[in-house]
Each structure stands twice: as structure tokens, then as C-alpha cells.
Amino acid sequence: MMEKGIWKDALIQSTKKLSPKLQVKNPVMLLVYVGAILATSLYFLGFFGISDEKSGYTLAIALILWFTVLFANFAEAIAEGRGRAQADSLKMARKDVLARKLKNVDDKTDVIEVASNDLKKGDIVYVLANEQIPMDGEVIEGAASVDESAITGESAPVIRESGGDRSAVTGGTTLVSDWLVVRVTAVSGESFLDKMIAMVEGASRKKTPNEIALQILLVTLSIIFLAVSATLLPFTEFASKQAGAGSAISITNVIALLVCLAPTTIGALLSSIGIAGMSRLNQANVLAMSGRAIEAAGDVDVLLLDKTGTITLGNRKASEFLPVDGVTEQELADAAQLSSIADETAEGRSIVVLAKERFDIRGRDFAEMHAEFVPFTATTRMSGIDYQENTIRKGAADAVRAYVTANGGTYPKECDAIVSKVAGAGGTPLVVVRNNQVLGVIYLKDIVKNGVKERFLDLRKMGIKTIMITGDNPMTAAAIAAEAGVDDFLAEATPEAKLELIREYQREGHLVAMTGDGTNDAPALAQADVAVAMNTGTQAAKEAGNMVDLDSSPTKLIDIVRIGKQLLMTRGALTTFSVANDLAKYFAIIPVLFYGIFPQLEALNLMGLTSPTSAILSAIIYNAVIIIVLIPLSLKGVKYREMPAGKLLSRNMLIYGLGGLIAPFIAIKLIDMLLTVLGIV
């Protein structure tokens, strides 16, 4: 399950955590800690004849209480140990390197070599191939391949370039080729890598609101049980005198009873559940800026999902050639192939492949044709080829219409009908024109990812609404939304429209999650309850989000929601189990503890425990051992299933509520029998 090194380190840390300064952070376990100290003191007082407490029995109680505290420490130390193991690999990427600081951006020969730790925000550095990027920054000049495997674990290099949404670089990553001029955006100790290490190690982990609320509940229950236990000594003294039978409860038994009734199981595991949840997110290559963000992910009920890369494969594929009247399909395919032969985009290559498959149209001798290729630009929104007094263009319908009209041609109405048909089916139409004559339309189809419809169905079962965000026109968006099975869509989306949509849902009381990578996504990311910024995105997007996906995968949002829900479920399930345990331990201890004074209570000794001594020993042994038994579950998390919240609650109440009632009865009885057979009691 875990490496031996982590186990060994956790055992050492368990003893170090016995420090009062650390124990006071967990009020419930502090109660056990104080109880262990008191029981130990009573043992020594009894040993030297100062007290009437049974020395052997008191020693056994004291030792079991100390082990209970150690087991709780061990659970937390194991979770922290996993985090430290992750952090150690990250620290290897964080090392001080010499940086070429430019005095003048325009003169790359005029540099000062400074240590990366001495760089300040705004400094300009020059990085060459095979060098490590010294600090987080924004590329202001150049384009290069960057190896980010030290952070993301992905071995394939990624492109980083100035301008656009791929300009952010991370300190500790390595340039594979070319060069970059980078403006530093962080100082030592505040870099992305530093934040990752701090988060993974748990150094900057703060208790979440739900965690604090649960701890307040546990402390309140502990105080109530403390008050009840404190009254037992005078009460039993009075009752035994009045009944003329039995004797007052001993201080050792009061301590043992208090520890058994207090919610120690969840108190011991609460911290490890939170740390393990953060660790699971880190293992998914997601950095959360706070535990609050993970909890919010568990409560999310609206997901805003980008169409491209999340719902569709991202690369549209040519599926049909649709000619206008008077033009054959092969004629259209021939012109489309010529206009796309130099197009290196996935869409362009798919047009060439389709022409070859349908009509066996292959490459030409472009040198002999004296061909000149026309690349696509955002201004013209067209690409094409000029050869031997022929001109072919392909592009968006409105761009081609403007081109044809400007050159004195006529744009056929029939083409409008074909364009509308393609858009209505969820495709992207590209119009082809040769020598100012419209030939027809290339049908580019968005390929919806396999299994995505089923995933959205699962999300719907969980009560989560999915909304597709796309820049496509409403007809295209509606067709893709229907095919993918999302609940709603936002077409022709702008940054302002996304921001307003998030606010609208939040006003209705929903929690909203979204992903983004560009500077234009920053306002919406800042507004969303769970905002996942892509690691390939801009600095502005990363700063606006409360999570960063190191893999830059838009589909990761669904996994983040699952991890958040699993964290909340694990905490809820173990709390239910712990409270149910207390009820069972109550029936184990109270009857045998008091039937000397009140013989009628013998009827409540449902387990038939041998004696008060064996009952208390069995109960506190179980109380300690159950912590160790539940550590794997607290670290791994309760298995999450896609079903409505009501069914999920009923299922967990049955497993962890009823299970929490039955397990102690069986375990305590078995321990009691073992103690009796061994002659310990």
C-alpha cells in the first residue's frame, strides 16, 4: 500500500506529535491525551501506595489510551508522509540556477548573471536551449519547446510563445529548443513550484469551513460527555450509599468511559481525511490553492464546460463535399484538396485525406504548376492557392461571400441553404470558390468524444447541471449539445456572457465550476466557486483561478468534482460510523459498570460481557484498534458512485450507520472472550 520509508517516517512522527503544542490542535484527541496522562499518574500513585487505584488495571488503561493517541498521530503522519514524498520529487526541480538578466530587451548580449533566488518581479531574463527557466514568468519574445515533466509528469515537450494563451512559463522547467525572453512574475518563495511544495507538504493547509464546523460539533459532544462523566463519581457514591450495594466508580473508569463515549474515531481521522483529499487532487495533477476549493468542488451543482477539448475532440474532420448545382462532387473535392494541400491544421489534412479516399485525388507537381499558397489569417478568414492564372479560396461562409462580392461575382442562394443545413447538423461549413465561382461546401464535423454522453448522464444522476460553452452559432451549438447530452449551452460566448451566466446561477443559490486558460477567461474564473485554470494558460488566468490543472485537460473538471464529493462523503461516512460506534459502546459499558448498584441494568448487558473490568478494557481496546483499521479508508476515500444524493445518503447510512452499530457489538464481545480465555480479566 505504501513504501516502507513512509511507514518508518510515520512511526517516528507519531511519537514527535505527542508534544502538547501539537496535541492541542485536535481538541477531541487532546481529551484522550489528558486522560492518558491522568491514568499514568494514577498508576504511579497506586504503585507507590498513595492511591487505591488497581495498579495493573490502571496501567492497562493508561497504555491503551497512549496507543489511541499514537494511532491518531500515525493516521495523520501517514497522510503527511505521502505528501512529503510528492514534495521531495518537486524539490528536485527547485534549485538555484544562474539567470541571464537583460539590461536592455533589445540587446541580448548585454546580460548580468544573477542567482534565480535574487530575481525580482519585472526582471527580464534570457533563456537558451537546454537551460532551466529560473523563475515563473511571462514570455515576451520568442517561441520554444519546454520540458515540464518535473512538474506535470508529462514527458512530451510543450510550446511556449509570446502573446496568446501559451505565454506562461514555470520556474524549474527546462527549455528543449530555441530561446525565450521572459519577464519574471514571481519572487523566490512565491513561485508556482514553491506553492505546489507548500500545498503538497501541508504546510499551508488550513482547515476548511466544513472541517471547522464538524470539529466544533465534535468538541461540543466531547464537552457534554465530559460533563456527564464528571458527575458520575459523586452520583455513584450517593447511589451506592442509598442502595446499600455496589461501590462508587473509580477515577480510572471515569476516564475510560469518557474516552469511549467521545467521538474519538472521527476526531483521530479528521485531519488525515483532509490531507488525503488534497493528496488525491495532487495525484490527479491538480494544484488547489486552498482546501475550501476542494470542498466547493464537492458541492458544485453547475458545470460550465468548453466544447472544444472537453466535449468534442477539438479537431474537426471533413466528412462530406456538398456541391452547388452545376458542379460535380469530384470537381469540388479537387478544388478543396488543392486549397488544403499546404494547410497543416488537422482540418486541412482531413480534407486532403477525404479527397484521396473518395476520388483518389493525390499530390501534384506544384513546382511545375508555379503554385503559390495563401495561408489562413484572422483578417481574411480564408486560405487557398494561386496557380496558372487560377485562384482557389476556402473559408467561412460570410468571408467567402464578401470575397466573391468584392470581386464582382455572385454568391448563390443555394449555398446559403447548404451552409444552414451543415450548421444545423452541428457541423462547420467551409465554402470553396474557384475563379470567383462558388463550387460548394466542405462539411467539417465536430467529433463528440466517446463516452462523454454517458458521463453527462452520470452527472445528471448526481444532480449536476452541465452547460456547454462555445463560440459556435446557436444552430451548431444546439446540434452538438443534443448529441453530447448536455443540459444547456451558451452559443457565441463572450467573456462578458460567461461572467453574467455564472452570476445568474449564483444568484439562484447554485455553486458553479468552470475551466479557462486565457486572459479573457480571468473575470469568469475569479467569479466561479471552483475555477480551474490550465497550466498552459496565461498568468492572469492562473491568478484568477483557485485550482491549476498541470495537464491542461479541460475534462479534468469532472474528475475534480468527483474528488471533492469523495472527500465530503468520506468525512460524512466516518462521522456517521463514529457516532454509531459511541451508541454501541454505551450499551457495552454502562450496564456492566452500574449493575452492582442497579441490578436491573443487567438486562441491558446484551453482549453478556464477563465483568465491568473486561467490558471497559474490551471497549477501549476496540476504540484504539478501529482507528488503525480505518486509516486505509480515510486515505483512499469512500468509493464514490453516480447516483442521486438521497440514494447515496441512504446507502451510506446503511453501510456506515448500521455498520457502525453492529461492528462494535461483535468486536467488543470477541475481545472480551479473548481477554477471558487469556486470563487477563
UniProtKB/Swiss-Prot annotation:
* A single BP term in Gene Ontology: potassium ion transmembrane transport
Q: Classify the protein's membrane topology as the record does.
A: Multi-pass membrane protein
Per UniProt, where does ATP bind? D343, E347, F376, T377, A378, T379, T380, R381, M382, S383, K394
Q: Which residues bind Mg(2+)?
A: D517, D521
In short, the EC number is 7.2.2.6
Keyword field contains Magnesium: yes
Give the reaction(s) catalysed.
K(+)(out) + ATP + H2O = K(+)(in) + ADP + phosphate + H(+)
The active site is formed by: D306
Q: Which UniProt keywords apply?
A: ATP-binding, Cell membrane, Ion transport, Magnesium, Membrane, Metal-binding, Nucleotide-binding, Phosphoprotein, Potassium, Potassium transport, Translocase, Transmembrane, Transmembrane helix, Transport
Q: Which residues cross the membrane?
A: 30-50, 59-79, 216-236, 255-275, 587-607, 615-635, 661-681
Instruction: List the InterPro entries hit by this protein, alphabetically.
Output: ATPase_P-typ_cyto_dom_N (IPR023299), ATPase_P-typ_P_site (IPR018303), ATPase_P-typ_TM_dom_sf (IPR023298), ATPase_P-typ_transduc_dom_A_sf (IPR008250), HAD-like_sf (IPR036412), HAD_sf (IPR023214), P-type_ATPase_bsu_IA (IPR006391), P_typ_ATPase (IPR001757)
State a GO cellular component annotated for this protein.
potassium:proton antiporter complex
Any idea which GO molecular function terms this record carries?
A: ATP binding; ATP hydrolysis activity; magnesium ion binding; P-type potassium transmembrane transporter activity
UniProt keyword rRNA processing present: no
Q: Where in the cell is it found?
A: Cell membrane
**What does this chain do?**
Part of the high-affinity ATP-driven potassium transport (or Kdp) system, which catalyzes the hydrolysis of ATP coupled with the electrogenic transport of potassium into the cytoplasm. This subunit is responsible for energy coupling to the transport system and for the release of the potassium ions to the cytoplasm.
Q: Which family does it belong to?
A: Belongs to the cation transport ATPase (P-type) (TC 3.A.3) family. Type IA subfamily.
Q: Provide the assembly information.
A: The system is composed of three essential subunits: KdpA, KdpB and KdpC.
Q: HAMAP family in the record, alphabetically?
A: KdpB
Recorded protein name is Potassium-transporting ATPase ATP-binding subunit
Q: What species is given as this protein's source?
A: Listeria monocytogenes serovar 1/2a (strain ATCC BAA-679 / EGD-e)
